C-alpha cells in the first residue's frame, strides 16, 4: 500500500475556497479541503501529514 500524500508545493494560500473535499490529518483533525490542509501543513513546518481522504 503506497503512502497517501498531497502535493502542497503551491501553498500556503492567503484564502481557501469553500469546497468540501475533506481530508483527515495526522493530528486527527478533519480539514475541509486540500487548501486548508496544506496551509496547516505549512504552519506545522511539515510535521502534519495526511492520514486519509475523507473525514476523520
Curated annotation (Swiss-Prot):
Marked site: Reactive bond 3: 18-19
Subcellular location: Secreted
InterPro entries attached to this UniProt entry: Bifunctional_prot_inhibitor, Kazal_dom, Kazal_dom_sf
Stretches assigned to the Kazal-like domain: 6-56
Presence of keyword Repeat: yes
Acetylation listed as a keyword: no
Keywords: Disulfide bond, Glycoprotein, Protease inhibitor, Repeat, Secreted, Serine protease inhibitor
Domain of life: Eukaryota
SUPFAM superfamilies linked: Kazal-type serine protease inhibitors (SSF100895)
Gene Ontology MF term list: serine-type endopeptidase inhibitor activity
One cellular component (GO) term of this entry: extracellular region
Residues bearing carbohydrate: 45
Pfam families: Kazal_1
Disulphide connectivity of cysteines: 8-38, 16-35, 24-56
CDD domains, A to Z: KAZAL_FS
Annotated domain remarks: Avian ovomucoid consists of three homologous, tandem Kazal family inhibitory domains.
Name listed for the protein in its UniProt record: Ovomucoid
Amino acid at each position: 500500500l503506497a503512502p497517501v500524500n498531497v502535493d502542497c508545493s503551491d501553498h500556503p494560500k492567503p484564502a481557501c475556497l469553500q469546497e468540501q473535499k475533506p481530508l483527515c490529518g495526522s493530528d486527527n483533525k478533519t480539514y475541509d479541503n486540500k487548501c486548508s490542509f496544506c496551509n496547516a501543513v505549512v504552519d506545522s513546518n511539515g510535521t502534519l501529514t495526511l492520514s486519509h481522504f475523507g473525514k476523520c
